[in-house]
Amino acid sequence: VHGHLRDPYHRVDVRRSSAHVVVRRGDEVLAESRRPMIVSETGLPNRWYLPMADVSAPLASSTTTTHCPYKGDSTYYGLPDQPDVAWGYHEPYDDTTRIAGHVCFLADGITTDVDGRPA
């Protein structure tokens, strides 16, 4: 088994948003978007996925990958001095195709604000 098995009671919803999302590391803005996707998944906090076109940081693909039975295989991205700060799905499964071309940030020292408030 690659990853974990699907739970028939698990739910993943992807919604478009017009919220103003800013991702920072300290004072450095890594990404800023007014067209994010919000992913709500059973048992997890909401995650904000931003279009790659709205990322200003110099992200590079890493060798880290993971598998989600609900979204598919992910690719991780790092900064020159910090690995694996974001991930995305190049070919997400049918129920989550809207997150293709988007990345989600989550790492030590990375903050995400939504409409001026911590996410």
Locate each region found by the language model:
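Terminal leader/tail segments of proteins
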Residues: V1-A119
